[in-house]
Design a protein with these regions (language model features):
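Conserved N-terminal beta1-alpha1 strand-loop-helix module at the mouth
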Residues: 1-48
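Active-site pocket-lining/capping segments in soluble small-molecule metabolic enzymes
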Residues: 125, 138-171, 176-185, 192, ...
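Catalytic cores of alpha/beta
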Residues: 101-114, 191-195, 220-223, 243-249, ...
C-alpha cells in the first residue's frame, strides 16, 4: 500500500520516522535497535536517507594530494530492503539529485523495482561540502522537479536513453519536501510554494516538512499552500529538542527558528537531562496541538533522538 493510502486508511494520526544508513564499515544492528525502540507505536512507514559522495584528499607524502570520492553512508537500497523484510513495514528510500547522474538514479530505480519497493521521497539534496551553491552532477537532474519527471518517464516505461522498458511493474509513487519557513535558497515564500505546486502537478502525492518548533508557522504554511491550490497531505516533520548547543546548531543547519519561549527555558536548564526533558515536553505539546488540528500524520526525524521520540510517542500514541 502506498504511503498516501496508509495515511488515509489509518484511524488515527499516523506515526512514521526517518533513519540513516549505517556508516561505511559498521553493522546494521544499531539501526535495528532504534527501530525496535519505536516499532511498538505502529509506524506506518520508515524513511531511509540517502547520502551523496564527497571529495576527500589523501596526502601522498611528496607534497601532492590525491582526490577521491567517498560515500560515508552507502547502502540505502539494501537497508530499505532489510528493514522491510525484517519488520514488514513499508520503507521509503530517499532519491536525490545531489551527487547522482540520471544513469545512477536509473540503476537505483531498477534495484528498487526488483525489490518491490515502490515508495520514494524525491529530493534535490544538499550541495557538496566544498560548494557554495548547488551544482548537479554531469547529466544529473538540477532540482527535484527534474528528478520527479525522470521517475515519471520510468513509470511510463522509458529509460533515460529513450529506449523502452519491456517489463511492466508497479509504478513508483513519491512524496516531496516542503518548508514552512521557506527553503534557504528561495527568494520568497511565494516562489517556494510555486515550485512545490509544480512538483505536485508532476505527481507528488504528499509533502513532508522540514523540522519546525513553532506550530503557527506550519499552520500558516498550510493555509498558503491550500490557497495556492495544493491539496495533497502536508505531513509535519518533527524532532525533539535535546541540547542547549542546538540553540545555535539547529538554526544554522536547518535554517529554522527556535521560539523564544523554548530558547529561554533551555538556557535555564542546568543539566543535559533537564534540557532533554524540556524538549520532550515541548514536542508533546506540539504534537497534541497538531493532532487536534487534524494533521494526517507526524513524521519524526530520529537521528540522535530515538529515546526522546519514544517518550513523546508513549503520550500521544
Amino acid at each position: 500500500m502506498k504511503v498516501v493510502d496508509l495515511i488515509k486508511h489509518t484511524n488515527k494520526t499516523a506515526f512514521s520516522f526517518e533513519v540513516l544508513p549505517p556508516l561505511k564499515g559498521t553493522g546494521i544492528e544499531k539501526l535495528y535497535r532504534s527501530i525496535d525502540t519505536l516499532r511498538d507505536f505502529d509506524p506506518q512507514y520508515i524513511n531511509i536517507t540517502t547520502h551523496r559522495s564527497e571529495y576527500v584528499y589523501k596526502e601522498l607524502g611528496n607534497g601532492l594530494f590525491e582526490r577521491s570520492r567517498l560515500r560515508r553512508r552507502p547502502g540505502t537500497v539494501a537497508v530499505a530492503a532489510a528493514i522491510h523484510n525484517k519488520y514488514n513495514i513499508t520503507t521509503v528510500p530517499h532519491i536525490l539529485c545531489s551527487g547522482f547522474s540520471r544513469e545512477d538514479i536509473e540503476y537505483v530505480l531498477l534495484d528498487l523495482q526488483f525489490l518491490n519497493i515502490t515508495d520514494l521521497l524525491v529530493l534535490r539534496g544538499d550541495k557538496a561540502k566544498h560548494e557554495s551553491t548547488f551544482t548537479p552532477e554531469e547529466n544529473g537532474p538540477a532540482h527535484a522537479l527534474e528528478l520527479a519527471e525522470q521517475i515519471n518517464d520510468f513509470n511510463r516505461g522509458v529509460f533515460v536513453d529513450g529506449s523502452p522498458i519491456k517489463v511492466t511493474n508497479t509504478p513508483f509513487s513519491y512524496g516531496v519536501a516542503c518548508y514552512p519557513e521557506k527553503h534557504e535558497e528561495a527568494p520568497n515564500m511565494e516562489q517556494d510554494i510555486y515550485w512545490l505546486k509544480k512538483k505536485v502537478e508532476a505527481g507528488a502525492e504528499y509533502a513532508v516538512t522540514q523540522l519546525f518548533y513553532d506550530n503557527r508557522k506550519y499552520f500558516q504554511f498550510v493555509e498558503k499552500v491550500r490557497a495556492a491550490g495544493i491539496n495533497i497531505p502536508i505531513i509535519p516533520g518533527i524532532k525533539p529538542f535535546r541540547k542547549q548547543s542546538q540553540l545555535s546548531v539547529i538554526p544554522k543547519t536547518f535554517k529554522v527558528d527556535i521560539p523564544q519561549e523554548l530558547a529561554l527555558e533551555a538556557l535555564k536548564c542546568t543539566t543535559e537531562k533537564e534540557t532533554e526533558r524540556l524538549g520532550i515536553e515541548w514536542c508533546i505539546q506540539q504534537c497534541k496541538e497538531l493532532i487536534k488540528h487534524g494533521v494526517p500524520s507526524i513524521h519524526f526525524y530520529s537521528v540522535g533522538a530515538v529515546e526522546s521520540i519514544k517518550e513523546v510517542a508513549k503520550v500521544i500514541y
